[in-house]
Amino acid sequence: MKFNITSGELVKALSAVAGVVPSKATLPILENVLFESVNGHLRLTATDNEIYVVEQVEAEITQDGSVAIPARRLLDTMRQLPDIPLSFDIDDRCIVKFKTDRGAYKLVGAKAEDFPSLPSVLEGTTVVIDTDSLTSAIEKTRFAVSTDDLRPNMMGVYFQVDEEKTRLVATDGHRLVRLIKYNMKGDIPVNFIIPDKALAQVTRTLNGGETTMQITKHHVRFTNGDAEVIARLINESYPNYENVIPKENEKIMTVSKEDLLATVRRVSIFSSSTTRQIRLNLSQNEVSIFAEDYEMSSEARESVKCQYDDEDMVIGFNARYLADVLNNVSNVDVTFAFSTPNRAGIVQPLDQEEDEDLLMLIMPVMLNTQG
């Protein structure tokens, strides 16, 4: 195999796929990137056997072929080079040689046939969506995904696709996000869970234009221009999340997202490093945020103007979880809907963005003092 390419183009393509390469793989071949000549282009593929990332790049192919090349060493070398022309020459023993106008380098590759084949994702449900809308939806939900290995069904974002809309749901038991996208529709209804790691790779790989999602029983494929991400789905049943969303929430507070978020971040510095507990005291058109740390004999209190005309109420939250929820609402003002201090609070943007309906839920914490 022989080809010519600039180091700038190669480092861009390598960076797009290398994020999935395991640093210490049980199968040594997975520490490589597969290089293939396909229809006059150079195609790069990387995988950890759960996620596959494919990137195609322009190159001058002078001899067709394929080879697996150590990913880290090649990428580290490319990053240290200026944007200059490179000539690659790979022989039948998988010896990889490449030259610049200044020097020559040699690596030992591996046979392409030892590299895992891409899963077949040919049939199933198809969804076509604007890429920016898709990546925005992923970012608004995946922050709430569980990291608990004992609950694998919650370690991804749950997609419910039908002919009219798609629901994306994520929860870790403390927070829950339900995002309905009306501009994201499937030709066949289907429900599936995509692992968080795969979605993180999707947001790094996809760039502009439209993205096509193809969903089969075991895999999902994202295609965006010359880039492709294939991921194995989580083969578990998702919890019945609708049951935990309170239906009657008569206490409504509307507040500036930025004002409340900044206040929560400041006051939480004084909260217990163990519980991260803060207290919200709701009163007429004002919410007071209070935190204290017994061990350090420190406390903080700030008030924020809001719209609230119900009876006074005190409710506690984990400061980090509350900040995460607020940080993932892009609108100016948010509404909080409460029923009682021991039931979940619902957070929504005052004005929903076009073609979507965002609902976030945060569980309260047991208050241990009266602040």
Region locations from a protein language model:
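Structural preference for solvent-exposed beta-strand-turn elements
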Residues: 1-371
